[in-house]
UniProtKB/Swiss-Prot annotation:
Record InterPro entries: His-Me_finger_sf, HNH_nuc
Family annotation (Pfam families): HNH_3
Organism, as annotated: Enterobacteria phage T3 (Bacteriophage T3)
Gene name of this polypeptide: 5.3
Protein name: Uncharacterized gene 5.3 protein
Amino acid sequence: MGGVATLRFHKMPTGCIVCVSHKRNQDGYFRYSIGSSRKGEKKHFMFHRWVWEQHKGPIPDGYEIDHICLNRGCCNVEHLQCIPKRDHIIKTNKERKLVKK
């Protein structure tokens, strides 16, 4: 019988808090699952979104959680902001252009 892996974190000099016990997905985010897949009760979530909701409350429809620090693996609530999806898309596209230069 397998157990649930314990979440472990590291605080970086930048203030980012990253999970060191789990791998990031192909997009650079941490996903976490709780519950039993045998019973069909397993829930998957993006960890930074879960952290936001635990500290700040529900994410309104049409809004997304943005990493102010640009580190998709960061789950420091001080480095997260809740912004409209459209603004998030514009911000992300601007950041990608800066990285390409």
